[in-house]
A protein has these predicted regions:
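Terminal helix-turn-helix DNA-binding modules in bacterial transcription factors
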Residues: 23, 27, 46-84, 90, ...
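Short hydrophobic/aromatic patch on the recognition helix
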Residues: 40, 44, 88-89, 93
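Short, Lys/Arg-enriched, Trp-marked, Pro/Gly-tolerant hinge/linker segments that flank
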Residues: 1-33, 46-54, 58
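Short coil turns linking two alpha-helices in DNA-binding domains
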Residues: 36-37, 84-85
């Protein structure tokens, strides 16, 4: 099957959206799609300007924002996205968005 880079990226994005797949490594995803890790990493860099890890983290945090906006608790979000702890999730969220998840929720509802 000859797919364009864009089609492959869409399939990978859909795959990573499935519950339980948010924390897969580049090695695991490349294996799932029958390509080398090096090829996957190059594809992500070319298509997004980010590393696979940066992109996957961004996808997780955008999901987190949506879930927090829908009323899911910080603990539930951290667990759903396979963070090792609430504090690990909070720290990463703050690194990306410059606010904690709790501050984000307060701002969203003010």
């Amino acid at each position: 099957l000859n797919l364009s880079s864009n089609e492959i990226m869409l399939r990978i994005y859909d795959f990573l959206q499935a519950p339980g797949n948010w924390s897969l490594s580049a090695d695991q995803v490349s294996s799932e799609f029958g390509m080398s890790t090096k090829t996957l990493v190059r594809l992500f860099q070319k298509e997004t300007g980010m590393t696979f890890h940066q992109w996957a983290t961004q996808v997780k945090l955008v999901l987190a924002m949506a879930w927090l906006s829908d009323g899911m608790s910080i603990t539930q979000v951290a667990h759903q996205l396979s963070y090792s702890s609430d504090s690990a999730f909070i720290a990463q969220f703050k690194r990306y968005f410059a606010v904690t998840p709790g501050e984000f929720v307060k701002q969203a509802y003010c």
